[in-house]
């Protein structure tokens, strides 16, 4: 299964000024709104699909916190990062993942 990792562009003045880096979903949406255009692609890869979506996302999270690929140049996967699977973005929140299209927890 192909995936893409997106991280907020910390050189974008709107991101820095809005203090959006590492914000939980509910705080981000309280003061502003999720905007995919403020993200940059930092990695694309493939992973074996797990038995469910949550497990697949957790496998990617683990990989980018414990075993970074040598060609990955972003920060460890953290709150406010987005993993895209099958064209749908999943926001890494404090304790779970949020579907960026529906705003619902996975």
Annotate the PLM regions:
Residues 27-84:
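Short, conserved turn/kink motifs that form compact alpha/beta structural patches or helix kinks used as
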């Amino acid at each position: 299964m192909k995936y893409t990792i997106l991280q907020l562009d910390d050189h974008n003045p709107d991101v820095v000024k809005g203090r959006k880096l590492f914000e939980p979903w509910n705080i981000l949406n309280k003061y502003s709104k999720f905007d995919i255009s403020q993200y940059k692609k930092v990695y694309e890869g493939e992973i074996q699909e797990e038995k469910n979506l949550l497990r697949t996302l957790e496998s990617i999270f683990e990989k980018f916190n414990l075993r970074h690929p040598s060609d990955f140049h972003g920060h460890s996967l953290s709150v406010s990062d987005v993993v895209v699977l099958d064209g749908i973005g999943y926001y890494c929140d404090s304790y779970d993942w949020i579907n960026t299209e529906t705003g619902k927890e996975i």
